[in-house]
């Protein structure tokens, strides 16, 4: 059975802004990556670059958005960093990230993040553990980013 990453994080912003932090290049570059090239539509690119001078490594080059509904959810393919590239980036299908947004209070949004597609061997277990930490830290970073400047 697959070991899905499931994370939940409440952040201090409205639903619209939370969604934009996953779909707008300038906002993605404020918390998740150095360079973003995202086209927020089904089959649009979802390419993030942590080293823009070496786009083939430590990036999601070639990844696509698989589903999107404004202020509700976004799903996209995902690749691994250089240490996992030899198996993650050639897997068919690639791993897959789904992010749902909900809000029951003004200026408070809950993000539900699921990362699926993990295979069952030790390399994949290491990659899965890496990404569980990475996504958790990224969501904490997003909350800290919002705390710095509550009005964007």
Where are these regions (language model features)?
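Beta-strand/loop substructures that line and gate deep hydrophobic ligand-binding cavities in soluble
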Residues: 85-133
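Intrinsic-disorder/low-complexity, polar/charged segments enriched in Ser/Thr/Lys/Arg/Asp/Glu/Gln
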Residues: 2-8, 45, 60, 73, ...
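A solvent-exposed, acidic/Ser-Thr-rich amphipathic alpha-helical stretch
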Residues: 34-49, 55-57
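Hydrophobic pocket/interface hotspot
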Residues: 18-19, 28, 46, 65, ...
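Hydrophobic ligand-binding cavity/cleft-lining segments
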Residues: 1-37
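Hydrophobic-ligand binding "helix-grip"
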Residues: 36-37, 58-106
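Short, highly charged C-terminal tails/helix-capping segments
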Residues: 144-152
């Amino acid at each position: 059975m697959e070991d899905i990453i499931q994370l939940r994080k409440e952040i201090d912003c409205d639903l619209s802004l939370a969604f934009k932090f996953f779909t707008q290049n300038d906002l993605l570059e404020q918390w998740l990556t150095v360079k973003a090239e995202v086209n927020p539509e089904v089959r649009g690119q979802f390419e993030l670059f942590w080293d823009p001078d070496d786009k083939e490594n430590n990036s999601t080059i070639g990844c696509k958005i698989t589903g999107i509904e404004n202020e509700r959810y976004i799903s996209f393919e995902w690749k691994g960093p250089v240490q996992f590239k030899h198996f993650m980036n050639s897997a068919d299908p690639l791993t897959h990230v789904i992010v749902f947004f909900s809000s029951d209070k003004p200026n408070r949004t809950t993000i539900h993040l699921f990362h699926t597609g993990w295979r069952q061997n030790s390399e994949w277990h290491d990659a899965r553990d890496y990404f569980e930490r990475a996504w958790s830290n990224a969501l904490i970073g997003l909350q800290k980013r919002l705390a710095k400047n509550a009005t964007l």
